[in-house]
Regions:
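Membrane-embedded, lumen/periplasm-facing catalytic core of multi-pass transferases
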Residues: 357-426
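Membrane-interface alpha helices of multi-pass inner-membrane proteins
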Residues: 117-118, 162-178, 185-188, 314-316
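Short acidic/glycine- and proline-prone juxtamembrane loop motifs at membrane-interface regions
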Residues: 39-40, 132-140, 325-326
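Transmembrane-helix signature of polytopic, membrane-embedded enzymes
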Residues: 13-18, 104-125, 142, 161, ...
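Perimembrane helix-loop-helix junctions
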Residues: 2-4, 150-156, 170, 183-215, ...
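Membrane-lumen/periplasm interface segments of specific transmembrane helices
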Residues: 34, 44, 180, 205-287, ...
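Loop-to-helix entry region of an early transmembrane alpha helix in multi-pass inner-membrane enzymes
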Residues: 65, 69, 73, 81-99, ...
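Hydrophobic, aromatic-rich transmembrane alpha-helices
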Residues: 99-105, 265-301, 315
């Protein structure tokens, strides 16, 4: 007999989720035809790419930018192939996202509904929005979730080739986003946990060898800290820590969790109800986060140990990250979705189950609106120019689309933005 609860595996809503999934596939493919969606970080990637390809002054911002080169390598490849246009950017992002979700589903396939899992991730406003941007999130998701899949298979099958694949995917994820160091750390912890008996015996018998290996690793980290951007990251963070004290960062993180689980950016509400809206998002995020952490780390469940370690390490980074943007959770949001679905299936508390059911309805409605609005703006250039990146590049987009600004507040334009649009838009 099928479950009546829409969030449980085997639910009678399975066919509905299947229909929603294929509708979302159509939406994501339709977004391939969007104009080039620029973001401040997108412009940095294009600047770094052109600096590498065509050269730039050694003291320019592009030459000294600390972004890792993993995503820039993709842009350079597309440039070499002559396909560096908005269509190719969104299409490869779609492939990255769907491929990454497939990898992760294989880890949780015995405990969660496939179409529900895909729908929850694909309907989240963060993915609806940023899959259409030239940003590194989707590439990171593909390689990080691929690394998780291969490591999980290694645990099950004990084949060294799978471990090598996991490390390769993890390394590419790290080269794409430096936060991938949390994944490498989780794999290391997972190996220690999986072979803890053998390693304790090896450690007792080879103390000097282990000490030498650790010393080499530390030395390598020091030597390569500059080319990997670690030094620059440290300097940037130390400056921003002064601007974002601890409790301010904590408030940001819980507000971001509220934005993820309500499935809408908080500014949409804060603009209307001021501080009350912000506090509501923080409160909801705090409640969901506490439930999540308690159920994941302090109650019995079958979530793989290394995935728990990965999420813990990622949270340690995030709760010390001196910037405010829910996009920073995108790399682990699919993992969060899979964990929530599995934990919810074992949830006995009726109040928690009811609360998540209500939240799920709100989530679906707001996600559907976000997906529809995204397609609408992709095919309406006037609205696109006015709303993309909150209108920051409105004048540049209007010049690109219509040959002149359409707004009477236009003052000055950014020549690099116009250059990127003229050269790399579809």
């Amino acid at each position: 007999m099928q479950s009546q609860n829409p969030l449980l595996p085997g639910s009678r809503y399975s066919n509905f989720y299947k229909l929603v999934f294929f509708s979302l596939v159509a939406v994501y493919l339709a977004d391939c035809f969007t104009p080039l969606r620029l973001h401040v970080d997108s412009l940095r990637y294009y600047a770094i790419m052109e600096c590498i390809r065509y050269g730039c002054p050694a003291d320019s911002s592009a030459a000294t930018d600390y972004f890792p080169y993993g995503y820039t390598a993709l842009l350079l490849l597309f440039l070499k192939l002559g396909i560096l246009k908005s269509f190719a950017i969104v299409f490869i992002n779609d492939i990255y996202l769907f491929g990454g979700l497939f990898f992760l589903y294989q880890v949780f396939r015995k405990t969660i509904s496939p179409f529900l899992f895909f729908v929850i991730v694909l309907l989240n406003w963060i993915f609806v929005k940023f899959v259409a941007h030239p940003l590194s999130e989707m590439q990171y998701i593909f390689f990080s979730l691929g690394s998780i899949f291969f490591f999980y298979q290694f645990i099950l099958r004990k084949k060294i080739q799978l471990l090598v694949l996991s490390l390769v995917f993890g390394w590419v994820a790290f080269l794409t986003r430096t936060v991938g160091i949390t994944l490498i750390g989780a794999i290391a912890v997972g190996l220690i946990w999986e072979f803890r008996v053998q390693q304790l015996a090896f450690l007792r018998n080879n103390k000097l060898l282990v000490g030498g290996i650790l010393a080499i690793l530390i030395a390598a980290l020091i030597v390569f800290s500059k080319p990997l951007g670690i030094n620059h990251y440290g300097n940037v963070l130390s400056e921003h820590f002064k601007e974002a004290p601890f409790f301010k960062r904590i408030g940001w993180r819980f507000k971001e969790w509220g934005e993820i689980f309500v499935n809408t950016p908080s500014n949409k509400f804060i603009d209307y109800v001021a501080k009350a809206g912000e506090f509501a998002f923080i409160a909801l995020g705090l409640i969901v986060f506490c439930w999540f952490v308690y159920r994941l780390y302090f109650s019995k469940n079958s979530i793989p140990f290394f995935i728990k370690a990965y999420f813990l390490f990622y949270c340690l980074i995030m709760f010390n990250w001196p910037f405010n943007d829910p996009r920073f959770w995108a790399p682990v949001m699919p993992v969060m979705a899979a964990i929530v679905l599995q934990l919810y299936a074992d949830e006995k508390n009726k109040i928690s189950r009811l609360a998540f059911s209500v939240l799920f309805i709100v989530y679906m409605l707001l996600g559907s609106f976000a997906a529809s609005y995204m397609v609408y703006t992709s095919f309406n250039k006037k609205v696109f120019a006015r709303t993309q990146a909150k209108g920051v590049f409105r004048t540049e987009y209007e010049i690109h689309f219509f040959g002149k600004p359409l707004n009477d507040t236009a003052t000055q334009t950014d020549p690099f933005v116009i250059h990127v649009l003229q050269k790399y838009d579809r």
